[in-house]
Regions:
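Helix-loop boundary and gating motifs at the non-cytosolic
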Residues: 7-60, 64, 225-255
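C-terminal ends and interior cores of transmembrane alpha-helices
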Residues: 89-108, 302-314
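A membrane-interface helix-boundary motif in multi-pass transporters
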Residues: 167-184, 375-393
Length: 423
């Protein structure tokens, strides 16, 4: 399967600033929903644990359908915004849905509402996230800017939404959803008027002027490197999510009161997100010099150290220090995976590879690992479970050192035609 997009790229265009705001508006909604939905469903929606579980199960299950489908559609559409507009317009209805549809229907059939809500939110978020991400990455290749610099908008949105969401939830719980509606409206406006792509450089992001047939997509599954990348993501990023799921319980065990532990955790998380935001700016410069494959391996090494270190930490100070390493991990993996897929695969199927290797495989693994890890926490405790999780990450990272092929640095946007690292 030959890589495309070898044509020299023209000088980068000036179109950049709309994309960080696109990232900001989308991930503002993301943080609001995943940060406060559970609390709202309990306090306002009066859902029990089983009903709330159905919402998240539907989101997780249907993501296995939406993610690969959206990947193929995105590769077909390339820079056309049909799917992006569908997602942003659907997000504009979040406020009206939860205010005027969800609550009245809860009194009629609560389980049906839970299923419909899961489908609706999965379409916008679990499926939609890869559509947003791959579009901005492709735009970065065509326009000549760094994806990581745009992604800073998403990191900033996480900090802003965490703070603003808590304040407006206390003021009026339903207002969190109207904040999403406002953000989605701005996102739609950005897609309409601001997010411009230099189509003269479209070949740098995969020229699909010729029909993208299913046989090309089918060849992905015959590539060893695709399976190696999937294994790497399963053994690192899926473990990352599983490790984080109940970390707050482990963290609070170092405190005499749950309230003190919760407050300290919020401060630590804010510091971690702030560090992530700051490191997003220099990370593309770093990855351009070390290579995206090496960036992925560095991510795996740091993650293994953090998980094993947490298990062996003698005091709270070490736990906090190791937790802050996550601020390094996210910029590393977000920038590296985007560049690696662009440089190691045919960019015409960029979105499909991204959706399948880094989202689809990860979702299945998180679903399986979450149950296994939960049982291990109860059976052998956090410390021993963390040692097992850390060992898995270490083994998979070592495997990647020998298995993952080197990317094409020019196609990945790491170096120019002369071989010089981009600044």
């Amino acid at each position: 399967m030959q890589n495309s997009a070898q044509a020299p790229q023209k000088k980068g265009s000036k179109h950049f600033w709309g994309f960080p705001f696109t990232h900001f508006t989308y991930f503002f909604m993301w943080q609001i929903i995943f940060g406060y939905l559970t609390l709202w469903m309990e306090q306002v929606g009066h859902m029990n644990g089983a009903e709330a579980g159905v919402v998240f199960s539907a989101m997780a299950g249907l993501s296995l359908l939406f993610q690969p489908a959206f990947g193929v559609i995105s590769d077909k559409l390339l820079f056309k915004k049909n799917l992006l507009f569908t997602i942003s317009i659907a997000a504009m209805l979040i406020g009206p849905y939860f205010q005027w549809v969800f609550l009245p229907l809860m009194s009629i059939n609560s389980m049906l509402v839970a299923i419909v809500t899961g489908i609706y939110l999965c379409f916008i978020f679990n499926g939609g996230v890869s559509v947003i991400e791959q579009y901005v990455q492709r735009a970065s290749l065509a326009n000549g800017f760094e994806y990581g610099h745009s992604r800073m908008g998403g990191s900033l949105a996480g900090m802003v939404a965490s703070f603003v969401g808590g304040q407006i939830f206390l003021w009026q719980p339903n207002s969190i959803f109207w904040a999403c509606t406002i953000s989605a409206t701005i996102l739609t406006g950005l897609l309409l008027f601001s997010d411009k792509v230099d189509l003269e450089n479209a070949s740098a992001a995969g020229d699909t002027s010729n029909s993208l047939d299913l046989s090309l997509i089918g060849k992905i599954f015959k590539l060893k490197n695709f399976w190696y990348l999937s294994i790497f993501y399963i053994g690192t990023s899926a473990i990352y999510d599983v490790f984080d799921q109940q970390f707050i319980i482990f963290f609070k065990s170092f405190f005499n009161s749950a309230a003190a532990g919760t407050q300290a955790y919020s401060y630590m998380t804010t510091a971690q997100i702030g560090l992530e935001f700051l490191l997003m700016f220099p990370m593309p410069w770093i990855i351009n010099r070390i290579g995206s494959r090496n960036g992925l391996i560095a991510y795996g090494v740091i993650l293994a150290i953090r998980i094993v270190g947490s298990a062996l930490s003698p005091s709270l100070i070490w736990v906090v220090f190791l937790r802050l390493l996550a601020g390094f991990e996210m910029p590393l993996v977000l920038v590296s995976i985007m560049k690696y897929i662009a440089g190691a695969f045919d960019v015409r199927v960029y979105a499909t590879v991204y959706a399948l290797a880094s989202n689809f495989a990860k979702q299945i693994s998180v679903f399986i690992f979450s149950a296994v890890a939960g049982n291990l926490y109860d059976a052998i405790g956090f410390h021993h479970t963390y040692l097992i999780l850390g060992a898995i990450v270490a083994v998979v990272t070592l495997f990647a050192v020998f298995a993952l092929k080197k990317e094409n640095p020019v196609q990945a946007g790491e170096r120019d035609e002369s071989g010089k690292a981009k600044s």
